[in-house]
């Protein structure tokens, strides 16, 4: 059976940590683990997912939950509550449901204090890792037989009915992910017509029916070129010379959004090298299978700008295509010939210097999974037997996750993000005496996960921002500061600082709190909004050069409603506890941030959410920030409009439900059939509670609470529904812990802020 291990480093000499691997999550297969009954339970969960895969596409993350509940000997002993039609919700009913949720969720905490959870969903994460390991000859070492079975299970589980795969697990079929999944199946040993339910034959038919892989988008062209299934001359240029441009130029990598910079850094190295993996018999077979014409007859120059309509979310402006054409025709031919190839050699050396710097400052985790595989391959190309590559191999397990739908690759983990919200939800429950050990461990995890130092050396020359005092999205080893993760963790530390140390442990040192505030202030823009990773401010026109076809707003850093709201809430709380620290700066920061939130409100009263679905999510965040800063329904028209938006979008069953299509379409779209989603319902509930809806008319809150109470499962869990996370407008992300955190939190706020009748009265 599969088993989740936390905070374990093992004895690998190529593995090192800044805090003894606190927050690390790795899976191992133990053939002797589990009883026959437990193994049967796992198989039942797999079968249930398979049979319902078109109805509920995200996993319920069952495997590790079974493991933890067994290890903790958890049994739900608090009786379940249901609210009948026409029945009032009593204080006792709300308390019982809340206690059941709190006890169940506390049992899912890891020993190091964090809450593990799947953070995956995009279907272009895993195949490049399989391709990279195939090229480097490490596939069978890293992924033995049991791993390969689970990878194939995941691919089969998320194949669409038409034979293709979407950009993410809920998306329509795309050429990019269908081609990658097909290649992955073939590398893992499936025949050209093999796989569950004829998966390969159906996938190949989809590919050929939609123009063959000549229509794959640019990232696909890159990976296929690396693998030997495409010619580099069919790709737009990615010159590594960008890394030796003068820094004052607007298109210098230092001006880019960090993820864009980090993806194209190793891509440009591999492009500059024109690296191609070994041409094996399988590669030759795939050349025949993926095209509608003979491989040797393809005019690669003509397919450079081809992109299947199913993949095309962001059409390239004419000016961008002209730029690529100019580089392709006039620049590249010179840079590959003497004497200009000397410049290319220098550019490649500089690029590799940056790759090594980023690898070392993230303990070889890198900033994310797309970059991880590319940087690992670049290190192998530089030196197949070198320590850099071996240190990359040691960190692959950090990205792997196993659930009832198989093995997948995570974004890189949401340990700190999930734990920050989990702690706030549990504290809001006011059930402190029942969960003291849970709170103490959670506090300890947050304290130990703060980034204590800036990136090494002259980090500004490496285009890095300060990170000291921040929290990451995942764990301390990852190293990359994020403003909203920092703000939410800071809120937790401030809440804990007001509680007895015998309950929650020693409070965080003042200087560490000050470092967090300093980091947040450094990420605020002139318009009052906060960026996520690095200061925003590059020219907006650079977005015209977005080289991807399926993302938007990826070239430069932007401000975000969620980051801004989280920072407001943290700053307001900090100001009350430390009124003398940078008083004027913090007051100005809060004022400007509030103005930013008011400025970006949509005409219908909502806010566009950047990291969750979508207008419901953004509106919950914005309302939290505004009310923390003292705005009310009566003194703030912005808040008034937000309340109107939420009231109007409430469903007939009392809940809220928003389609993920709101994110790419940028227009509020209800779930099909006007059904509700419990996570969306929780966000909307908390937004209304922030605005003191209970004082005006508690009916919408009672209706929503009834839905949450009646939806709770026998164990105290809540059912998994639609995917709720998003990034870059068009790609969804599955936060498996959300279905527990937010209903629990909403019920806690409801019980605390809404007057409820008591049975005893």
Swiss-Prot record:
GO terms for cellular component: endoplasmic reticulum membrane; lipid droplet. InterPro entries: SQ_cyclase_C (IPR032696), SQ_cyclase_N (IPR032697), Squalene_cyclase (IPR018333), Terpene_synthase_CS (IPR002365), Terpenoid_cyclase/PrenylTrfase (IPR008930). The keyword Membrane applies. It is found in: Endoplasmic reticulum membrane. It is a peripheral membrane protein. It comes from the Eukaryota. The record marks 417, 473, 611 as: Transition state stabilizer. Monomer. Component of the oleanane-type triterpene saponins (e.g. ginsenosides or panaxosides) biosynthetic pathway. Oxidosqualene cyclase converting oxidosqualene into beta-amyrin, generating five rings and eight asymmetric centers in a single transformation. This is Beta-amyrin synthase 2. It comes from Panax ginseng (Korean ginseng). The lineage of its organism: Eukaryota, Viridiplantae, Streptophyta, Embryophyta, Tracheophyta. The gene is OSCPNY2.
């Amino acid at each position: 059976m599969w088993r989740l291990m936390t905070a374990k480093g093992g004895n690998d000499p190529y593995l090192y940590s800044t805090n003894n691997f606190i927050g690390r999550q790795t899976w191992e297969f133990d053939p002797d683990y589990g009883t026959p009954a437990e193994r049967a339970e796992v198989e039942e969960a797999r079968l249930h997912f398979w049979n319902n895969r078109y109805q509920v596409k995200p996993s319920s993350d069952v495997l590790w939950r079974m493991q933890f509940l067994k290890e903790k000997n958890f049994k739900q002993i608090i009786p379940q509550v249901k609210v009948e039609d026409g029945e009032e919700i009593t204080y006792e009913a709300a308390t019982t449901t809340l206690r059941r949720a709190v006890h169940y969720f506390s049992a899912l905490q890891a020993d190091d204090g964090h809450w593990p959870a799947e953070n995956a969903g995009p279907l272009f994460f895993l195949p490049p890792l399989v391709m990279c390991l195939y090229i480097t000859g490490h596939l069978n070492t890293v992924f033995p037989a049991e791993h390969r079975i689970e990878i194939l299970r995941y691919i089969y589980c998320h194949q669409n009915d038409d034979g293709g795969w979407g950009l993410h697990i809920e998306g329509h079929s795309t050429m990019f992910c269908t081609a990658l999944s097909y290649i992955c199946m073939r590398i893992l040993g499936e025949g050209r017509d093999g796989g569950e339910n004829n998966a390969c034959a159906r996938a190949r038919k989809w590919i050929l029916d939609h123009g063959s892989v000549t229509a794959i988008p640019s990232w696909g062209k890159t990976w296929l070129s690396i693998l030997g299934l495409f010619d580099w001359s069919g790709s737009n240029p990615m010159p590594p010379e960008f890394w030796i441009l003068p820094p004052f130029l607007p298109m210098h990598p230092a001006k880019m959004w960090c993820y864009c910079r980090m993806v194209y850094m190793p891509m440009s190295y591999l492009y500059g090298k024109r690296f191609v993996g070994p041409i094996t018999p399988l590669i030759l077979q795939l050349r025949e299978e993926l095209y509608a014409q003979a491989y040797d007859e393809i005019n690669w120059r003509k397919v450079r700008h081809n992109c299947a309509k199913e993949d095309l979310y962001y059409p390239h402006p004419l000016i961008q295509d002209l730029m690529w054409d100019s580089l392709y025709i006039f620049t590249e031919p010179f840079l590959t010939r003497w004497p200009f190839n000397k410049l290319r050699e220098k550019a490649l050396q500089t690029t590799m210097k940056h790759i090594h710097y980023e690898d070392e400052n993230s303990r070889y985790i890198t900033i994310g999974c797309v970059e991880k595989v590319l940087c690992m391959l670049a290190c192998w190309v530089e030196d197949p037997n070198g320590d850099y590559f071996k240190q990359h191999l040691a960190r692959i397990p950090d990205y792997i996750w196993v659930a009832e739908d198989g093995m997948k690759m995570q974004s890189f983990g949401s340990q700190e993000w999930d734990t920050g919200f989990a702690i706030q939800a549990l504290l809001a429950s006011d059930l402190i005496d029942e969960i003291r050990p849970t709170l103490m461990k959670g506090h300890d995890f947050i304290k130990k996960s703060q980034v204590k130092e800036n990136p090494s050396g002259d980090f500004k020359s490496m285009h890095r921002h300060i990170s000291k005092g921040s929290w990451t999205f995942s764990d301390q080893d990852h190293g990359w500061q994020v403003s909203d993760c920092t703000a939410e963790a800071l809120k937790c530390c401030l809440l804990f600082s007001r509680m007895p140390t015998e309950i929650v442990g020693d409070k965080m040192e003042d200087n560490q709190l000050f470092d967090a505030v300093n980091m947040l202030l450094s990420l605020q823009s002139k318009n009052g909004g906060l960026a996520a990773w690095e200061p925003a401010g590059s020219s907006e026109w650079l977005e015209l050069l977005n080289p991807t076809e399926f993302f938007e707003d990826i070239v430069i850093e932007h401000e975000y409603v969620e980051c801004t709201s989280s920072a407001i809430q943290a700053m307001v709380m900090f100001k009350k506890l430390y009124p003398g620290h940078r008083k004027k700066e913090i007051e100005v920061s809060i004022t400007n941030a509030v103005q930013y939130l008011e400025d970006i409100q949509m005409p219908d009263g909502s806010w566009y959410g950047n990291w969750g679905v979508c207008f419901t999510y953004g509106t919950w965040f914005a309302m939290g920030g505004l009310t923390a800063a003292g705005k009310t329904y009566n003194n703030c028209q912005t808040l008034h409009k937000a309340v109107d938006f939420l009231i109007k979008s409430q469903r007939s069953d009392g809940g809220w439900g928003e389609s993920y299509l709101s994110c790419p379409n940028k227009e509020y779209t209800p779930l099909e059939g006007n059904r509700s989603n419990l996570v969306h319902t929780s966000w909307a509930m908390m937004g209304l509670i922030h605005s003191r809806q209970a004082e005006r008319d508690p009916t919408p809150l009672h209706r929503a609470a009834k839905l949450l109470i009646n939806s709770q499962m026998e164990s105290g869990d809540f059912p998994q529904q639609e995917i709720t996370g998003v990034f870059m407008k068009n790609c969804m992300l599955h936060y498996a812990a959300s279905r527990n955190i937010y209903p629990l939190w909403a019920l806690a706020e409801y019980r605390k802020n809404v007057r409820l009748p008591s049975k005893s009265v």
